[in-house]
Amino acid sequence: MKVVIVGGVAGGASSAARIRRLDEHAQIIMIERSGYVSYANCGLPYYVGGVIKEQEELTLQTPESFWDRFRIDVRVRQEVTAINPAEKTVTVRALDSGKSYTETYDKLLLAPGAKPTVPALSGVDSERVFTLRTVEDTLRIRRFVEDQKPKTAVLAGGGFIGLEMAENLVEMGVSVTIVQRPKQLLAPLDTDMASFVHAEMRRHGVALRLGETVTRFRQDGDSVLTLLEESEPLRSDMVLLAIGVTPDTHLAKEAGLELGIRGSIAVNERMETSVPDIYAVGDAVEVTHFVTGQKALISLAGPANKQGRIAADNICGGNSHFHGSQGSSVLKLFSLTAASTGINEKAAQAAGIAYDRVVLFPASHATYYPGAQSMAMKVLYEKESLRLLGAQIVGGEGVDKRIDVLATAIRAKMTALELTELDLSYAPPYSSAKDPVNMAGFMIEDLESGKVRQFHWNEVEDLPCDGNATLLDVRTEGEYRRGHLNGFRNIPLDDLREHLDELDRGKPVYVNCQTGLRSYLACRLLTQYGFTCAHLSGGYSFYQVVTQEQQTARSAYPCGMEKL
């Protein structure tokens, strides 16, 4: 059997190695147009920033190591320019010599990946405008940074690569501005959770120009101007385009393969395309979203590697299936970690799913053990079935652990109530006896059993401020003085029983505390004394962070934030 693989990196390289493990006698040819066949593309921003010191540390395999260990024929700096499915051949052009040749195949695997989205704007070809996708891109940026020593940079786009590059440039002393049309960074997060990311970026001096449209770029001497639709131009020493990626599928289209959403390659669960004996994996293919069942593009290394393995199994006569991806991801930003899995509120609404959510602020480990760090956790679940839909966590230590537990729970199709039963490891330096994941389950259990009701930060503006409801803040007097929601009366939780006669049982009570725990306790107390009660999900801390990121909207709130 002769297998030709178009593209290396994650999907192609993992598939090649798997084929060899399954079939020692197969002829395997891997064709890669760049000079690097298998490298850690997720580490590229950290090489630019000097966190990863040596270029060799990014290299996972070389053509020589592939041959020595696997007897795989790797051809770098060569590009497949055409596929002939009828004759089962590919046309290959050697980039250095310009010469072309034809290669036959029995099985063909396409792993072309995705290319940076470059807008059709004037000035994008400036020598000071960069994209980051390959090792060659990385070397070009690093040479520029070392030689030119830029003081300012504009990043067009606020996705994973853009934010990681922003952090690394800031650590190198570069003043960074992020500009993008969407009004929030990190699309997998909901707006409220993204507010924590915005605050962290601003805390480290990153200027955010969100909701703005770039119209063109213009080089002006040793700087480049980023022209905006409704604002003054931004002058900087360099620009990085990090708008996103587009599936690189021109070969598949020209060969007559069926295409999916946004021009991606359509494949089945066996990673087979619409043409016999042609498989496809990685960022170029559409996948089924594990939660919604809808087609999606999920450009992540984890799914690409799994798809490569599955395609290899099937190429070698197996029957393996890829059951979709839920887009689990994690990102380091200065002292913050942001992670998500499954779907967010926007995606749930688009899919027509009736859902609810809980917000909590657990600690990374037992608070009596030194070094505990807080995290904001949001868990979404379907109302009727109680199945888990997604989770988002932003904080310090322990975020990655909890998102992985929740990702596993989603994959296992657990209900939200089953989170209460998870038997997770505990010792004071690592967790609490009731892990944050357990706590999320407990909260959902209380909501669904009717033991407590909640309202959310974006509903504060709708609270009745005309005396038809009791607005109650159960934090300490000192906490209340440092900042509170306008119209809320302060009765500390520990004193609440002594003040019950001052409250009108005929009016609904809306309770607020710092993170949602004391307000929950207050609601349980009040409910048992005949009051109708709801508490603010996430508490004042959550409300404060979110509304500080939405100052214009906040100023219109009749029950907005009042600072004394």
Q: What function would you assign to each model-found segment?
A:
Residues H25-Q27, R69, R75-D96, E103, ...:
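A Rossmann-like FAD-binding core segment of flavoenzymes
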Residues L110-M172, A207, I261, V267-E269, ...:
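Glycine-rich dinucleotide-binding loop and its adjacent helix/turn
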Residues L417-P428, S432-A469, E477-Y510, Q514-L564:
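Rhodanese-like catalytic fold shared by cysteine-dependent sulfurtransferases
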Residues D125-K149, P233-D313, V405, A409:
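FAD-site-proximal beta/loop scaffold in flavoenzymes
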Residues M1, A284-E397, P428-S432, P436-D462, ...:
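Mid-to-C-terminal Rossmann-like scaffold of FAD/NAD(P)H-dependent oxidoreductases
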Residues M1-R77, A166-L189, S328, K401, ...:
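Beta1-alpha1 glycine-rich phosphate/pyrophosphate-binding loop at the start
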Residues V6, E103-G113, A156, L234-G244, ...:
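Short hydrophobic core segments
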Residues T59, T152-A153, F160-R218, I298-A304, ...:
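Rossmann-like dinucleotide-binding cores of NAD(P)H-dependent redox enzymes
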